[in-house]
């Protein structure tokens, strides 16, 4: 009886604080290897004792966000970025062919183990992304979170339906497949089939999903933007990488996408709507800057950018807490 009273007393003391605390959402943008900077932001939030209630991610942001939602700490994610052989994972490199200058297997040509994309072939990409999907599945299985429903933190994964050019937000089902879809760059990776849809990189339409966090119920949204220039949601040179989608969109659809660039207008709107906008300084990094040294440098950049805005975040949490707990 005495033990029960102690538990009830503790619960009653904690509930008012929880009720008055604003819900914090974290919007993690895409940017390939630059996603390591997002790990630096998570490290600062953990050190400051700031709990994240909702996460939305696009492309590499979905990988970081999904694994964090599954229970991986920032320190564990740092180890992953610094030690994982990302190039082999992402390119489906066959280690058994490392010493083979040219080898064709099942219609795919490999150069020293790396699959080569035939620029004249029609299709969406030669790389299946199977290896990265397997690794993610193994990682989330260790934490007991193979699907969205079992995650420790509510999470949304942003993808693009390549047939309709519509944004698709995944919130249930198999986690590893959703994460694979969100980082499937058209023309490089094969799309993921999901409930009758063909899904690819969410960054094509929403590379900074602040709006998704807001829809989840966040009072405060922290956005981590990995873009490094004012007009960079998708560089002009990246258009070559999406040429494969012409098979389903049609040439007219591709030209319309390139002309209207719906991702840019949404990107700037989401930037404006973010309560805390974190923009790590990564001038010499690009989406392929994997490796231990690069990861370490980008994690530090994310840490520095987050620490700079930590006082603003604390003040916002304090002010919002007073607003949330104030009597009606």
Task: Pin down the residues of each PLM region.
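Patatin-like phospholipase
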Residues: 18-58, 66-328
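Sec-dependent N-terminal signal peptides
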Residues: 4-15
